[in-house]
C-alpha cells in the first residue's frame, strides 16, 4: 500500500463508489489527482528529473451531430508530466459518457471542448486528437522494442514491492540497449483492481542485471498505485540504483472502461515517436 493511499485528496473520488451515469455533457465529472502525492513520496523536487506525457487512448468516444445522428471516434490525449494533476480514470470515463446524447455542431467543437476541459482538470494545456475509426485502418499492432527479459528460469516467492531488489544491478560494462517486459502488474490505488501492462526501458550507461530488473518489476504485482505513479517510481528507482546517463521508461497498459493509459518518462524527449497499440490493448 502506498504511503499516501489515505490522502484527503483521494477521499472524494468517484472511483470505487456506486455512480450514476450521465448522458448529457458535464465537465464537472472530471476529477484531478495531485501529482505531488506520489512525487513527495519519491522525494522529487520542483525540478523534475524527466520529461514526459501520459498518453490516453479513448476507444468509447461518441456524441450526436447537429441532426441527432450518432458519431463515433477514437481519441488520443497527451497530458504533460509537468501538469499539476493527473486525471482519475473513472471520472474520465464518466465524463466521456456524458457526451453520448449531447449534440455538437462539428468534430472540431468536440475536440475543442475536450481540450478545454481536460486542460482545466490537469492544470496545463493538453493535446487532443479526435480521429475517425478509418484513421487506424493501416496502423499496425506493435510490440515493444529491444530484448524481452521475461523468459528467465528464476524462482520468485515474494510479490511485495521492493526497490532494493535493484541494489547492485549496475554492472561494469557500459552499454546502450532497450529491454522490455510484459510482466508488469500492479493494483489500482483505490479499488485494488489489477492493472496489466508492458514496460520498455531504454538506457545508456552501466549494464543493468536482467534478473535483478525482472525481480524488481515483478515486485509491483501486489503494489497499489496509479499507472502514472508506477512508471515514475520505476524511473526514479532506476536512476537511483543504476545511474544511467540516459533513461526512458514507457509503459503501455491494457484498457479499462474504454480507456488505456500509456505513461512515458524520459531524460531525452517528452513523448514517443508514435502511439501504436499493442496486442493486449
Curated annotation (Swiss-Prot):
PANTHER family: NADPH-DEPENDENT 7-CYANO-7-DEAZAGUANINE REDUCTASE. Catalyzes the NADPH-dependent reduction of 7-cyano-7-deazaguanine (preQ0) to 7-aminomethyl-7-deazaguanine (preQ1). Residues 261-281 are annotated as: Disordered. It holds the Pfam family QueF_N. GO terms for molecular function: preQ1 synthase activity. NADPH binds at residues 89-90, 256-257. The active site is at 188 (thioimide intermediate), 195 (proton donor). This is NADPH-dependent 7-cyano-7-deazaguanine reductase.
